[in-house]
């Protein structure tokens, strides 16, 4: 394999897949060495001077003319954003050339990325023109058969043929007008490998797999899923429009119910989605959708990449869930795992690795193909059929199930040959662009992001990367990798460190701000205080770190709150709100943490006697009116509604004007709002001066100390805060905290308040400052609008939902009576 070197003066020839000059199944052509032609007109997709050498498709043009690939690019847009990147020009030239060369080959021999990514319509089991056709890539197999319930597991009459690319196929005519392989019947791929042994495997492209739940450790069986038209779920609702800033609710369907059992897709759709919408999230991120034989892996050891996890239902049930989310105005992201695969042999993709060469396997050979910490297999991203498999996998979930995007898991492991194991990243650019960089994987991600944004321009693609790789979240045509967002993974680590190791008085305001704002310019981040990672057994959620065992005895509103409970609820609200407001360009919360779900997540396993007790969500806690969980939930609902109204996450205006270590106060502006956070354990500041940009009158927009949020009601919501000019006009150094205006506020301990500048026209819309008092609710109402119209921050669909309503929107109520 070719490895990157940042010191090379010219880019070497691309690593081509085995028999690269090849057609896809059913496409005529191919059969020789690749011949690269050169023409005179330069490619316009990449800025700067180019030297012609290799050919790529002119994808921006309507015709199929072949034009030149860049060998060297004098200038890329990413250099304007970060001039330090130009030092690694050789790396980017190499990366771009590899990407364009791969696109060229796919265009030439497969008809382009869009056609290439339709692999799921050619591979696996498909019905075409009165016959069932099955294709499988298994170059190491010497003989192959299709077996299943349809032939009593006897493949003697269903032997398969192999082509020169290692693809086995069989065509079985319909019997009496019906498919020879019935819907919902079990199937397997039987083949003999070089050692002479016959083995049975689940088809790699299978769309459904099940196991016998009555038998301990029973292996999975592949199931042919091809329901008749009357049983297929038909989507009824359009995709919601892409929000300016995603507010993501991370969820696991299986553990989403109250009962100690695996919940279903339909139960989640009917019972949990309305809760998510009521809390004013605009996006749902679903974990563990791809089939995984080990439930406790949280879905990250995938065995069957095209199969819906059967524990929670069928593919049609999952479609119902996604469609229901769309009807509520919720976009749906899928947690996709392309960084590795389960080590399982009998029911996983690893079963196709029978000791052959790396170009004949989905995975690298030897140590390079094994992740020693995850005990899993690592893909060979330079392999032609691996690219087809993974790119088609993305398209399958996006086209067939209407997912609106993906969260790519384990991107750090993909970016580097060392996979980030025992590696601390200091920010030195040589850590990102060196021989350790896995260019094969980067090229795959560039192809994937280009494809997804071409198929669905409004797609949202999120990368889980802890390294801080530069330009990971810049467009491919600028020289980036193409993701829309990366997760701000340092933020939860900071909060956990403080809650475990530091007294409140020793919290550093500047350190908190530095952690929240430490992100690359022009590369968007999703901020979160805690995700599923902080909830698993062995760790604790923020609420449980704050209140611990007192959550068992002190959450009743029928008794006075203890100091621990008061502190816990106050800091729970503050930590999540400052993370949202200052930490990124989007926000994420894991299911249940919005109301401070106690304890931890522990999947059923031998060590807990296969118990589901800690693998569920106790919604009754937040639904019980006399328990204090309702306060944290109400604040979560209100801060999401505040962002919906003011769109501060998508604003480029972010100014931190005060980080007072003595007072334990942080003041900053984000968008049109001024935020004041007082982390001091017991000091109230009266007449505390707060800097701001624009003069005028300010009022409370959101107050964590409001009674409706379990606070003490110390901040007046009917008070107008008038600004005073600061310093000399035009002389910023004479301003207060570098702000030209200021106003004074009351700031109680352990509270956070957001202030907005009064606009009388806007006041009419706010109807009396409902958000400020915490009197904001989401209700279903009849509204008239065209399909897809946004009304007062809420989504309106043309179809009626299950409640008989035509749509929904946020309703701001202004009186105490209205909120009862």
From Swiss-Prot:
Classification via CDD domains: AmyAc_bac_euk_BE (cd11321), E_set_GBE_euk_N (cd02854)
Record-annotated site: Transition state stabilizer: 533
InterPro entries: A-amylase/branching_C (IPR006048), Branching_enzy (IPR037439), Glyco_hydro_13_cat_dom (IPR006047), Glyco_hydro_13_N (IPR004193), Glyco_hydro_b (IPR013780), Glycoside_hydrolase_SF (IPR017853), Ig-like_fold (IPR013783), Ig_E-set (IPR014756)
Binding site for (1,4-alpha-D-glucosyl)n: 153, 188
Catalytic activity: Transfers a segment of a (1->4)-alpha-D-glucan chain to a primary hydroxy group in a similar glucan chain
Top-rank taxon, per record: Eukaryota
Keyword vocabulary terms for this entry: Amyloplast, Chloroplast, Glycosyltransferase, Plastid, Starch biosynthesis, Transferase, Transit peptide
UniProt KW Glycoprotein keyword: no
Major subcellular site: plastid
Biased composition (Low complexity): 1-20
EC id: 2.4.1.18
Active site: 409, 464
UniProt pathway annotation: Glycan biosynthesis; starch biosynthesis
GO biological process terms held by the UniProt record: carbohydrate metabolic process; glycogen biosynthetic process; starch biosynthetic process; starch catabolic process; starch metabolic process
Start and end residues of each stretch annotated as Disordered: 1-28
Further remarks about this protein from its record: Isoform 2 lacks the putative transit peptide and may be a cytosolic isoform.
Assembly description: Monomer.
Function as written in the Swiss-Prot or TrEMBL entry: Catalyzes the formation of the alpha-1,6-glucosidic linkages in starch by scission of a 1,4-alpha-linked oligosaccharide from growing alpha-1,4-glucan chains and the subsequent attachment of the oligosaccharide to the alpha-1,6 position.
Family according to the record: Belongs to the glycosyl hydrolase 13 family. GlgB subfamily.
Protein name from the UniProt record: 1,4-alpha-glucan-branching enzyme, chloroplastic/amyloplastic
Organism listed in the record: Oryza sativa subsp. japonica (Rice)
């Amino acid at each position: 394999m070719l490895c990157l070197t940042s010191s090379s003066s010219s880019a070497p020839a691309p690593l081509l897949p085995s028999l690269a000059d090849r057609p896809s199944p059913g496409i005529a052509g191919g059969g020789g060495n690749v011949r690269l032609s050169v023409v005179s007109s330069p490619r316009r997709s990449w800025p700067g001077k180019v030297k012609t050498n290799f050919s790529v498709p002119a994808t921006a043009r309507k015709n199929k003319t072949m034009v030149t690939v860049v060998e060297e690019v004098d200038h890329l847009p990413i250099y304007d954003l970060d001039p330090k990147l130009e030092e690694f020009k050789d790396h980017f030239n190499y990366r771009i050339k590899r990407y364009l060369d791969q696109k060229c080959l796919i265009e030439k021999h497969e008809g382009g990325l869009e056609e290439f990514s339709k692999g799921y319509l050619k591979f696996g089991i498909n019905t075409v023109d009165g016959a069932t056709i099955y294709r499988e890539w298994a170059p190491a197999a010497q003989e192959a058969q299709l077996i299943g319930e349809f032939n009593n597991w006897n493949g003697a009459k269903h032997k398969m043929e192999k082509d020169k690319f290692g693809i086995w196929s069989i065509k079985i005519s319909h019997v009496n007008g019906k498919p020879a392989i019935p819907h919902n019947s079990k199937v397997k791929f039987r083949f003999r490998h070089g050692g002479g042994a016959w083995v049975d495997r689940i088809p790699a492209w299978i769309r459904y797999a099940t196991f016998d739940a009555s038998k301990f450790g029973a292996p999975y069986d592949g199931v042919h899923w091809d329901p008749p038209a009357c049983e297929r779920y038909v989507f009824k609702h359009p995709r919601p429009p892409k929000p300016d800033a995603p507010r993501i609710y991370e969820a696991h369907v299986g553990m989403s119910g109250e009962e100690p059992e695996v919940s279903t897709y339909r139960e989640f759709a009917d019972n949990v989605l309305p809760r998510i919408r009521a809390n004013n999230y605009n996006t749902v991120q679903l974990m563990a959708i791809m089939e995984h034989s080990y439930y406790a892996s949280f879905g990250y050891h995938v065995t069957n990449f095209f199969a819906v996890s059967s524990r929670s239902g069928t593919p049609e049930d999952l479609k119902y869930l996604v469609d229901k989310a769309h009807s509520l105005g919720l976009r749906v992201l899928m947690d996709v795992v392309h960084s590795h695969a389960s080590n399982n042999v009998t029911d996983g993709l690893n079963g196709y690795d029978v000791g052959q060469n790396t170009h004949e396997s989905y995975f690298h050979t030897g140590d390079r193909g094994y992740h020693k910490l995850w005990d899993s297999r690592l893909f060979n991203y330079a392999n032609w059929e691996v690219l087809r498999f993974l790119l088609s996998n993305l398209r399958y979930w996006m086209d067939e199930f209407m997912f609106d995007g993906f969260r790519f898991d384990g991107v750090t492991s993909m970016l580097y040959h060392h996979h980030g194991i025992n590696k601390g990243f200091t920010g030195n650019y040589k850590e990102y662009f060196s021989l350790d960089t896995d260019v094969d994987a980067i090229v795959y991600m560039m192809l994937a992001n280009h494809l997804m944004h071409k198929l669905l321009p409004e797609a949202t693609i999120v990368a889980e990367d802890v390294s801080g790789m530069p330009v990971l979240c810049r467009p491919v045509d600028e020289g980036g990798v193409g993701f829309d967002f990366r997760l701000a993974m340092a933020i939860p680590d900071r909060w956990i460190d403080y809650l475990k190791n530091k007294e409140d008085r020793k919290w550093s305001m500047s350190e908190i701000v530095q952690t929240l704002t430490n992100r690359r310019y022009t590369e968007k981040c999703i901020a979160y205080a805690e995700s599923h990672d902080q909830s698993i057994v062995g760790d604790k959620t923020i609420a449980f770190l704050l209140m611990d065992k007192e959550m068992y005895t002190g959450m009743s509103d029928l008794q006075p709150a203890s100091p621990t409970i008061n502190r816990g609820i106050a800091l729970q609200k503050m930590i999540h709100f400052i993370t949202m407001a200052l930490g990124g360009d989007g926000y994420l919360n894991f299911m249940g943490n919005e109301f401070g779900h106690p304890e931890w997540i522990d999947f059923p396993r031998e060590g807990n006697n296969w118990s589901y007790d800690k693998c569920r969500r106790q919604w009754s806690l937040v639904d019980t009116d006399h328990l204090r969980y309702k306060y944290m939930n109400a604040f979560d609902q209100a801060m999401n509604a505040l962002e919906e109204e003011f769109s501060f996450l998508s604003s480029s205006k972010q100014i931190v004007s005060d980080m007072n270590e003595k007072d334990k106060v942080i003041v900053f502006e984000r968008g049109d709002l001024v935020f004041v956070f007082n982390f001091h354990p017991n000091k109230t500041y009266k007449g505390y001066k707060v800097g701001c940009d624009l003069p005028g009158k300010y009022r409370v927009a959101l107050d964590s100390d409001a009674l409706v949020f379990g606070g003490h009601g110390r901040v007046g919501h009917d008070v107008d805060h008038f600004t005073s000019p600061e310093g000399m006009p035009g002389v910023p150094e004479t301003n207060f905290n570098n702000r030209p205006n200021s106003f004074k506020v009351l700031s109680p301990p352990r509270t956070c308040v957001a202030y907005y500048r009064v606009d009388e026209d806007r006041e009419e819309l706010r109807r009396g400052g409902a958000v400020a008092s915490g009197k904001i609710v989401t209700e279903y109402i009849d509204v008239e609008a065209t399909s897809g119209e946004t009304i007062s921050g809420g989504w309106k669909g043309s179809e009626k939902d299950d409640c008989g309503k035509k749509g929904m929107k946020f309703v701001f109520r202004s009186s105490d009576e209205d909120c009862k």
